[in-house]
C-alpha cells in the first residue's frame, strides 16, 4: 500500500525513492511486524482469556505439562495480523506471488481458527474432524498450485540442492507434488508445536532462510550467477518473509518458556502452509526438507510411531512427536527447545551453503 501511495511521488520528493528498494521495504516489514506484535499482543492475550480460550492439556502426556492448563491459546491470530498488516503496507500489491502466499496463509489460518474455536471456546473436544481439516487444506493448496501453474505459468521443473544440472520436469505430476509440499509443511509445523517456543523459533529461521532465496530467485543476475531457478517477481516475497520473521520473533516474546500464550492450530497450520508455498514458488521444494529438518523429523516420528504400533504392536518412542520422547527421558523442556533451535540454525546454514556447493 505504501509502495503504491508514496513511490509515485518520488519524482517530486526524492526521499520516497527508497520505496523502490526491496531491501528497505523488507527491513521495515520486519519492524512493522514486531510493532504489531508488541502493540496488539497484550490486548489479544486479554481477549483470549476473556473468551476462556484456554489450552486443553492431555492427561496422558508429560506431567510437567499439567501446569500449562489454562494458558490461552489461539495466539496465532496475533501472528496472522503481524504477517498480513506489514505485507499489505510494504509489498507491491500487484504481485501475484504475494497474494497467492497470503491466500494460503489466511486460508489455513481460518481452518485452524475453526478447529481451535470449536475445541476451546465451544468446548467440543473433537473440533474439526481430521477429514474435514485435510479436505480444507487440500482444497486451498490445490487452488493455489493450479493458479500458479495455469495462470502464472510457473515452471513444473524440480530443482535439487547440490545438483545444478538436475531439473526433472514433473509435468502434471507437479500439481499433486506441490500440494503435498504445502499440506505436509503445514501439518509438520502443527505437530512440532508442542512446547513453549519450539515451533515459532524454527519457523522464524526458516522464513529468514527463504527471505534470502526469494530475493535471489527474483534477481536475474544473482540466480544466473548462483545457477538457481529464476522466478521473475518472486523477489517481492522477501517482504512477506520479512513479515514472517518479525511476526515470529514478536510472538516468541509471549510464547517463550514459560509461555503466556500458545499459537494453536490457527498459527501452526498457517505458518507451515506459508513456508510450503514459499518453497513451491521459489522452486526450492526439496530445500525445505533440509532447512525444515526439525519439522520433518517431528512428522516422521509420528508416522513411524503409529505405523510401528499398528503393525508390530510396539512403540518406537516413549511418546510422539519426538520432543515428548525427550521430555519423558528427563530432558528439561527449555533445553529441548533451545537444542531444536540450534539444530535449525545449523540446517539453515547447510541450506544456504547449497548456493555455492553445486
From Swiss-Prot:
The chain crosses the membrane at residues 25-45, 73-93, 97-117, 134-154, 172-192, 197-217, 233-253, 261-281, 286-306, 335-355. Pathway: Cell wall biogenesis; peptidoglycan biosynthesis. It comes from the Bacteria. Keywords: Cell cycle, Cell division, Cell inner membrane, Cell membrane, Cell shape, Cell wall biogenesis/degradation, Magnesium, Membrane, Metal-binding, Peptidoglycan synthesis, Transferase, Transmembrane, Transmembrane helix. It is a multi-pass membrane protein. Its EC number is 2.7.8.13. Belongs to the glycosyltransferase 4 family. MraY subfamily. This is Phospho-N-acetylmuramoyl-pentapeptide-transferase. It comes from Geobacter metallireducens (strain ATCC 53774 / DSM 7210 / GS-15).
Amino acid at each position: 500500500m505504501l509502495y503504491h501511495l508514496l513511490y509515485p511521488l518520488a519524482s517530486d520528493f526524492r526521499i520516497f525513492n527508497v520505496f523502490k528498494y526491496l531491501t528497505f521495504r523488507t527491513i521495515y516489514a520486519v519492524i512493522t511486524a514486531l510493532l504489531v506484535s508488541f502493540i496488539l499482543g497484550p490486548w489479544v492475550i486479554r481477549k483470549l482469556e476473556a473468551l476462556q480460550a484456554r489450552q486443553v492439556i492431555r492427561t496422558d502426556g508429560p506431567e510437567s505439562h499439567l501446569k500449562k492448563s489454562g494458558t490461552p491459546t489461539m495466539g496465532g491470530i496475533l501472528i496472522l495480523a503481524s504477517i498480513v498488516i506489514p505485507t499489505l503496507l510494504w509489498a507491491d500489491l500487484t504481485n501475484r506471488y504475494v497474494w497467492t502466499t497470503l491466500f494460503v496463509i489466511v486460508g489455513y489460518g481460518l481452518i485452524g481458527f475453526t478447529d481451535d474455536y470449536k475445541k476451546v471456546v465451544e468446548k467440543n473436544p473433537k473440533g474439526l474432524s481430521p477429514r474435514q481439516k485435510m479436505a480444507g487444506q487440500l482444497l486451498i493448496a490445490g487452488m493455489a498450485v493450479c493458479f500458479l501453474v495455469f495462470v502464472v505459468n510457473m515452471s513444473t521443473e524440480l530443482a535439487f540442492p547440490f545438483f545444478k544440472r538436475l531439473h526433472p520436469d514433473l509435468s502434471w505430476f507437479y500439481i499433486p507434488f506441490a500440494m503435498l509440499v504445502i499440506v505436509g509443511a503445514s501439518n509438520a509445523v502443527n505437530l512440532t508445536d508442542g512446547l513453549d517456543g519450539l515451533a515459532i523459533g524454527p519457523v522464524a529461521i526458516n522464513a529468514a532462510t527463504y527471505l534470502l532465496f526469494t530475493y535471489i530467485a527474483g534477481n536475474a543476475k544473482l540466480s544466473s550467477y548462483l545457477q538457481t531457478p529464476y522466478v521473475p517477481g518472486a523477489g517481492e516475497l522477501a517482504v512477506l518473509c520479512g513479515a514472517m520473521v518479525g511476526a515470529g520473533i514478536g510472538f516468541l516474546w509471549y510464547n517463550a518458556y514459560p509461555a503466556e500464550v500458545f499459537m494453536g492450530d490457527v498459527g501452526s497450520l498457517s505458518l507451515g502452509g506459508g513456508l510450503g508455498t514459499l518453497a513451491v514458488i521459489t522452486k526450492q521444494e526439496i530445500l525445505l526438507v533440509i532447512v525444515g529438518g526439525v519439522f520433518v523429523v517431528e512428522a516422521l516420528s509420528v508416522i513411524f510411531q503409529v505405523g510401528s504400533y499398528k503393525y508390530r504392536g510396539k512403540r518406537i518412542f516413549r511418546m510422539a512427536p519426538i520432543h515428548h520422547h525427550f521430555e519423558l527421558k528427563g530432558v528439561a523442556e527449555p533445553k529441548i527447545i533451545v537444542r531444536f533451535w540450534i539444530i535449525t540454525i545449523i540446517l539453515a546454514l547447510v541450506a544456504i551453503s547449497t548456493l555455492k556447493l553445486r
